[in-house]
Curated annotation (Swiss-Prot):
It is a single-pass membrane protein. This is Ion-translocating oxidoreductase complex subunit G. It comes from Pectobacterium carotovorum subsp. carotovorum (strain PC1). The chain crosses the membrane at residues 9-29. Its EC number is 7.-.-.-. Part of a membrane-bound complex that couples electron transfer with translocation of ions across the membrane. The gene is rnfG. Keywords: Cell inner membrane, Cell membrane, Electron transport, Flavoprotein, FMN, Membrane, Phosphoprotein, Translocase, Transmembrane, Transmembrane helix, Transport. It is found in: Cell inner membrane. GO terms for biological process: electron transport chain. NCBIfam families: PRK01908.1, rnfG. GO terms for cellular component: plasma membrane. Its cofactor is FMN. It is an enzyme of class 7 (translocase). Pfam families: FMN_bind (PF04205).
Amino acid sequence: MITTMRRHATTLALFAAFTTAVTAVVNMLTEPTISHQAMLQQKMLLDQVVPAELYNSDMQKECYVVTNPALGSSAPHRVFIARQDGEPVAAALESTAPDGYSGAIRLLVGADFHGKVLGVRVTEHHETPGLGDKIEVRISDWITRFSGQTVQSEQDARWAVKKEGGMFDQFTGATITPRAVINSVKRSALYLQTLPSQINTLSACGENQ
């Protein structure tokens, strides 16, 4: 009886060790593929907010961490720098619209350093399906209306929904969502105007994290 129990215990231990080893090997083999896919998805997103013809550097390799109230929260946000022949010409900035209808809306805002927005994409949100989710490019082209628009100053009243005197459409039955996104993009573009002088002082992504 005792011998049989020991044999079963040994078998279970060997099976557990084998399973653990197989899992480790599978993780080791799939991790590079998952990482590669994540990099490809990131590159596609960056290309949507900063046109590739504007720069000849590798944006993914120049990533910094920034913290500023203008970005919508006290959490660190990443910014990717685009350079043309070594000179910074634009950036893609992670930003947060904290006042969405159903919570925070995460954005990626591409802009040059003179207030011109190059592109915007929503990376995460919890807005109401059929109403606030029109901020998604797969559902509506509304988010593309920012491309080419310039923020002249913090007092630029054009950066509002049309019912409030601005130049951007609101959604039927949903004004809070577009207002939150508009304000976040505006703040991000204004912040990016100050960035070139700070680049040499920023921490690279991955440092102290």
